[in-house]
Amino acid sequence: MPNSKIGGHYSQAYDEELQQAVVRLLQMAALAQQQLDDAMTAFIGADAELAQQVKDFDRKVNNFEVDIDEHCLDILARRQPAATDLRLVLSVLKSVNDIERIGDLAKRIAKALLKDESGNRPTEVQLAQLNTMGAKVQQ
């Protein structure tokens, strides 16, 4: 990561462990964002196949959460970070939780489409509101 403030420790391995936590977090965030985009697209376009892919994709996001949690707990146990490093690790742990929740909500959107067998489609106004909500979430 260019211009990163992570580093400057005597142990290069420690710097790399902290950097890896952030990199994994960003990868997870990108996956969850794609999952949400796909869920919105599937819902608006009534695309059951894409909705099923969103549901199936949730496992990847959940696996990232477990992996990052274990990585951060390992850092806490072995390195006993202080000050800035501790705040970084705790921020990653909190963010992972929030990102995983976004993935869960995207899955719920997909499941709602898959369960709706009535063929009822949202009105144009409802679709516009849904697009607005989706755009706000992406910010």
PLM regions with names:
Residues 1-139:
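Cytosolic, long alpha-helical scaffolding segments
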